[in-house]
């Protein structure tokens, strides 16, 4: 088979056995070692793939068609690349093949357009030898011990290794600690006899997808790329340059991995700062939101971050733990980062304390009180509940005997969340009506979706605890709105 193959691995997936005629076992692989003499000339592997990329003839494969992988697939499909998407979830595959979507910011119309331009979805992982390049962007969660869980990355690399052929480009996109590409992915890919930088090419380029962001999307967000060696870097830069507005090459995969960890840790520690100031300023009778709005009028030296009920999403609450873990492996302590994590983790307890105080002021205990949580997605106007602080808030309120329910126009049913003690709630979003609002003892604003009419909610709810400053400017009797 001439030329190289490109495989992009991205998204939210759950790996068991890969489906298809030749399934990959979870713990064992059968990889054929190819003698060097049987390989194509190594000198012929690099240039043909560069040419195919520039002519947009290279086929792009994406494993994991979730919040990262599907927008990435669209970015390449829109530029004329044939895209083959992989996912172990056959339901997702069937829906995509029908031109349907399951992600809010990638509409069915967009998916139909992708299909018309040659996009194909499959759950048959033995087809991994068909694309011309490989990008890995599978989830990288934490274990119960809050340590890096690279299961999805490792299983993806094993799946690729079984089908890997000379000339393919593999790019890891999953957020992870510096060293993962070289120390974890490379040895797995080389287990069949092919050598990175000679027989196939390897790079790291961190995903920067921001679901729900109408200003920035996959094609417009600059792409940082670090190659294992110069030819791998050249190929990865050439590939992303075809679909992205800007590509930023760095010296190594480790530099690119460290870049993403820096970005997310920077955000986490600054949110921790304003969360701590929120607690302090509240004690002093100062509105932290007013202070931030005033401070951001300074045209230099200040960037606004906002407090909230806790961190959410698949990156910000998790990635700093990857950095602290690898720091400990090097005999160092990241005290500042770990302290920020403690502050952010404490926010749900702080909010529940404010709810309890507000109810006590009305002569009611938390136990037995009806509390409606508004918004269970981790941020505004997305349908992603991963790591949402709403789950911890719900846990804490249930433990104190509250009667809890929720409304979220984007989350019709709560998914099972393994971290939580009451994770099998099987709770569905309640309709937001005048009668339901009036029947609650407290309405807790967790996520400020734009679909909510705050004046209407304030009018009919007896008590509101607002963690997002969503009710700013809304007239209400004194004490009806409590900021937390």
List where the protein language model places each region.
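Structural/interface elements that position substrates and couple domains in central-metabolism enzymes
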Residues: 28-484
